[in-house]
A protein has these predicted regions:
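Charged, low-complexity intrinsically disordered segments
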Residues: 16-202
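Short, positively charged and aromatic/hydrophobic N-terminal segments
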Residues: 2-6, 12-18
Length: 202
């Protein structure tokens, strides 16, 4: 699969491996033209499920496969499948069928269909329900980190190398980098940035 990134100026890679990575998170909703104008020297990389190149694998919806389900003796094909599958609603418990969904579509379990969300179950057969922020820390963060470390090291290395030589703009539909902010969905692009910079949240 061809990697397609956007840059106005190619430039030469610097040899100083100690240069601090330059990674910026921007909204996928912005036009490519406006982003190029704002960051004329940057490499712009789409890391959403709508990316048209290999960087789509960074999407939590992508079926990277073999992902251990936290507190459960099972594996899943995507991070989002785990996140949605372990949700517990007023009218529905966990749904392990989401662990095997590969098409990156219809992965959301909504309150409109199932009633208020009560939390995330701590394991498929667990009795404890986790709050939103706690679930982020115990389910989402370790699952996404596992994917970065076990499935995407070549792409992570590519982002790291490029970002030491020119700014890299990662496009995501969500831009919230604060794990402890319950008001906005967490940006997975911010987790890529944090991982590359060596400060992945725990």
């Amino acid at each position: 699969m061809k990697i397609n990134v956007y840059s106005e100026k190619s430039g030469n890679f610097a040899s100083d491996s100690k240069m601090k990575p330059m990674i910026i998170i921007e909204s996928k909703k912005k036009t490519l033209e406006s982003l190029k104008a704002q960051y004329p020297d940057a490499m712009i990389i789409d890391v959403t499920s709508h990316a048209q190149d290999e960087f789509v694998k960074f999407s939590p919806f992508y079926p990277n496969c073999g992902i251990p389900v936290p507190f459960t003796d099972d594996i899943a094909v995507s991070v989002e499948g785990i996140w949605q599958g372990l949700k517990v609603f007023e009218d529905a418990d966990v749904d392990t069928s989401y662990f095997s969904k590969r098409d990156m579509k219809n992965l959301k379990r909504t309150v409109r269909k199932y009633g208020p969300c009560l939390g995330h179950r701590k394991g498929v057969h667990g009795e404890e329900l986790l709050g939103y922020i706690e679930a982020r820390k115990l389910i989402y963060l370790p699952c996404y980190k596992w994917v970065l470390e076990n499935k995407l090291q070549k792409l992570v290395a590519a982002v790291r190398i490029i970002s030491k030589n020119k700014p890299v703009v990662l496009l995501d539909y969500n831009t919230n980098p604060d794990v402890n902010n319950p008001k906005k969905p967490l940006s997975h692009a911010s987790l890529i940035k944090a991982y590359v910079e060596g400060n992945y949240p725990e």
